C-alpha cells in the first residue's frame, strides 16, 4: 500500500533576508501528487473565481498585473488594500481544508490520500516532526490545496460582499496568498 513520506525541509532566502521553509517531497509522492493534482484541477478550475490567478493553468503573474492595471485605471479606484496573508502555507488549517475539500470530493480514497500528505510530517536534519497545520511550500499539490482553501475562506466571501454590500466599484486580484483590493468608496 502507498505511504506518504515526510517532506524534506530545506530553507531558501527571501528578498527581505529571512528564510522560507520548503518541503521537498519524495519522488514517489511527487508522482502521485501530480496525478491527484490533475484530477483535482478538473474539479476545481470550474469553481475558482476569475480574480484568482496564482498557480492556475493558463494564468500568470503578468495576467494578474494586467488585470490589476485594467481594474485600477478603468474603474474609479480611490483606495487600495495590498495584503499578504503572513505565514499562510505554514499555518493553513488541515481541519478546515478537509472540510472545504469535502464540498466537492465524494471519493473517500482521494480525501484519505490528501490527508496522508498533510499529516506526513517533515524531516529536518534527520529528525521527523509531525505536521498539524500547513501544507509544504514546494510540494506539487500544495498550490492547488492553497487555492481551494482560499477559494472558500476568502474569495467567495469577498465576492459575496462585493455584490451585496459594496457601495462603489471594487477591483480584486488575488495571486496565491497575496491580494489587492481597489475601492471607489472609502466606506467600502
Regions found by a protein language model. Name each.
Residues 1-11, 15, 47-59, 63-188:
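Conserved polymerase palm-domain catalytic core
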Residues 21-22, 26:
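Conserved phosphate-binding loops in nucleotide/dinucleotide-binding enzymes
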Residues 34, 38-51:
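Electropositive, glycine- and tryptophan-enriched low-complexity nucleic-acid-binding patches
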Amino acid at each position: 500500500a502507498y505511504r506518504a513520506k515526510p517532506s524534506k525541509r530545506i530553507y531558501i532566502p527571501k528578498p527581505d533576508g529571512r528564510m522560507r521553509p520548503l518541503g521537498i517531497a519524495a519522488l514517489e509522492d511527487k508522482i502521485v501528487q501530480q496525478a491527484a493534482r490533475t484530477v483535482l484541477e478538473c474539479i476545481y478550475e470550474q469553481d475558482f473565481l476569475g480574480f484568482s490567478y496564482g498557480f492556475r493553468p493558463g494564468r500568470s503573474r503578468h495576467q494578474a498585473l494586467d488585470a490589476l492595471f485594467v481594474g485600477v485605471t478603468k474603474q474609479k479606484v480611490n483606495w487600495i488594500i495590498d495584503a499578504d496573508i503572513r505565514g499562510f502555507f505554514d499555518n493553513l488549517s488541515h481541519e478546515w481544508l478537509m472540510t472545504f475539500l469535502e464540498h466537492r470530493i465524494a471519493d473517500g480514497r482521494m480525501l484519505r490520500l490528501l490527508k496522508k500528505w498533510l499529516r506526513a510530517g517533515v524531516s529536518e536534519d534527520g529528525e521527523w516532526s509531525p505536521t498539524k497545520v500547513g501544507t509544504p511550500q514546494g510540494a506539487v499539490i500544495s498550490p492547488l490545496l492553497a487555492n481551494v482553501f482560499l477559494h472558500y475562506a476568502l474569495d467567495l466571501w469577498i465576492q459575496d460582499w462585493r455584490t451585496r454590500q459594496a457601495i462603489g466599484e471594487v477591483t480584486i486580484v488575488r495571486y496565491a496568498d497575496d491580494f489587492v483590493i481597489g475601492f471607489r468608496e472609502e466606506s467600502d
